[in-house]
Amino acid sequence: MRTCWVFDHPAHVRLLAPFLRSGTASDVIIATNRHEVRQLMESSEGVLPRRQTIWVERPVGKGRYRTAWKRMRTVRQELKSASKGGNRFERIVAVGAPLELRVAKKLGIPNRWYISDTEINHFAHKLARNVATDAIFPNHWDESIDDGWLNKFSQKVNLHRLNGLHGHVHLQPQLRPVQVQEPPSFVV
């Protein structure tokens, strides 16, 4: 299954690295052009497999809407050109990055996975809710500060709950508790 992986933060690279290693050679990575992400991607020889990488800018600060629009346009052009020859993408997986999911819906990518670990990222949740087909939230999600987004997601998408603490997965994935060592079968 050809997959597009979206890395917005170094922790996302570490979180999704085992899944990327078990993917296919035709997978594509969309990575934010941040110093930490670029350094981690370039220094991961032997840890992360080499994949076609699309570097995009991070839409923050003054001009963030223009940057977001350029980011979506770049992703659309690159994914279209990568899909030529009949080798279409079947899935896109993004951690807190809804812009790529919006592009994926327009391109007809059937499985669009949104993973969130931050209850207060309301703007990203709003953008992802109408375009994601599946969403993953941790079991320790605090509904008292999420402004009702968990319920809103459960009405529109297939909602999955992931066991384990967020910090364990991001900081040292090899030290996760035994009961969550196996990757969930719905992402593999």
Name every feature range the model reports, one short phrase each.
Residues 61-88:
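An amphipathic, basic-hydrophobic alpha-helix
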Residues 133-188:
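A nucleotide-sugar donor-handling region in carbohydrate enzymes
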Residues 113-114, 125-137:
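A conserved, positively charged/aromatic
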Residues 2-4, 88-91, 185:
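Structural motif
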Residues 4-7, 25-71:
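Conserved nucleotide-sugar phosphate-binding/catalytic loop shared by glycosyltransferases and other
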Residues 9-23:
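Short amphipathic alpha-helix
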Residues 91, 105-119:
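Active-site proximal beta-strand in glycosyltransferases
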Residues 13, 39, 92-107:
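An aromatic- and histidine-rich active-site surface loop
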